[in-house]
Amino acid sequence: MSIKIAIDAMGGDHGIKVTVPASLEALSKFSDISIVLVGNQPLIEAELANHKYDKNRLSVEHAEQIVEMDDLPSKALRNKRKSSMRIALNLVKDDVAQACVSAGNTGALMAVSKFVLKTLPGIDRPAICTQMPTMKGHVHVLDLGANVGADGQSLAQFAVMGSVLAQAVDSNSRPRVGLLNIGEEEIKGHQRIKDANEILKSSDAINYVGYVEGDEIFKGDVDVVSCDGFDGNVALKASEGVAKMISFYLRAAFNKNLLTKLAGLVVYPVLKAFKAKVDPRRYNGASFLGLRKIVIKSHGGADVFSFYHAIAEARLEVNKNVPELIATEVKAILETH
């Protein structure tokens, strides 16, 4: 199967300086994909001139406009119809491409994606989902900011979508799914969390294990965590901050004097493995779950390594037919309510 991925080449903080080389890296790693770079054609072709690549597997689609990182979603929808983001999504809508990857404005990308691609039947709100490292591997957490104040029905839908994604990309036939809460007791939490808990307990569609607290996200005892967008975004940013703090203190400790520097050389392979494990760049590529087609959001400040991983995530989800699987599972759980 040949997969075509539409890249919003102008999106993000670094634009074509990141998206073009990352796309070429993906082409070199995956023989089953082709890429269409959407954006300012003269600028993209000037950047491509600095690289060697298979011209049969890469094309350029010109776009006159760019969705800026500070553009309101409404502006992106109404006034940026010829933007690289909008055209890339249109290519997916028209089945020219099977997935879109963008490092652009998150709010704008979600709004335009919902307008162009629409949501799956039974899905009220799409959710942003990404992987976070744990003691035993990784966990899929959603929502990460698209939905603040999600109701119980939406939280239950997030749980189902996250479970489907974990089954597909991790080959996990029965992923353990939890609801983020301030305690494990039934009486704790907002009413919407309690409502989602009741919905999920009454269904056999997923392997629901109950409430999980914030510290349990990283233990590796659950594979999926469903939460409100506000809570999820705070958890994600806090985990990234803690990883940076630990790295800072480790560097400071091993650079203290000659003896600690020598000790650092001895344990360098261990530290390198640790850094790779918690490096957020490896987990770049958040899925917009609940849409009819695949959209992957890269971090706005992504470097080439990070953006490459977002493209790899898009390829994986196309291969696994994630939207179709989500539609089937959501239908099953809705039929019980």
Curated annotation (Swiss-Prot):
<dbReference type="InterPro" id="IPR012281">
    <property type="entry name" value="Phospholipid_synth_PlsX-like"/>
</dbReference>
<comment type="function">
    <text>Catalyzes the reversible formation of acyl-phosphate (acyl-PO(4)) from acyl-[acyl-carrier-protein] (acyl-ACP). This enzyme utilizes acyl-ACP as fatty acyl donor, but not acyl-CoA.</text>
</comment>
<dbReference type="GO" id="GO:0006633">
    <property type="term" value="P:fatty acid biosynthetic process"/>
</dbReference>
<dbReference type="Pfam" id="PF02504">
    <property type="entry name" value="FA_synthesis"/>
</dbReference>
<dbReference type="InterPro" id="IPR003664">
    <property type="entry name" value="FA_synthesis"/>
</dbReference>
<comment type="similarity">
    <text>Belongs to the PlsX family.</text>
</comment>
<keyword id="KW-1208">Phospholipid metabolism</keyword>
<dbReference type="GO" id="GO:0043811">
    <property type="term" value="F:phosphate:acyl-[acyl carrier protein] acyltransferase activity"/>
</dbReference>
<keyword id="KW-0808">Transferase</keyword>
<comment type="subunit">
    <text>Homodimer. Probably interacts with PlsY.</text>
</comment>
<dbReference type="GO" id="GO:0005737">
    <property type="term" value="C:cytoplasm"/>
</dbReference>
<keyword id="KW-0443">Lipid metabolism</keyword>
<dbReference type="GO" id="GO:0008654">
    <property type="term" value="P:phospholipid biosynthetic process"/>
</dbReference>
<keyword id="KW-0963">Cytoplasm</keyword>
<comment type="pathway">
    <text>Lipid metabolism; phospholipid metabolism.</text>
</comment>
<keyword id="KW-0444">Lipid biosynthesis</keyword>
<keyword id="KW-0594">Phospholipid biosynthesis</keyword>
<protein>
    <recommendedName>
        <fullName>Phosphate acyltransferase</fullName>
        <ecNumber>2.3.1.274</ecNumber>
    </recommendedName>
</protein>
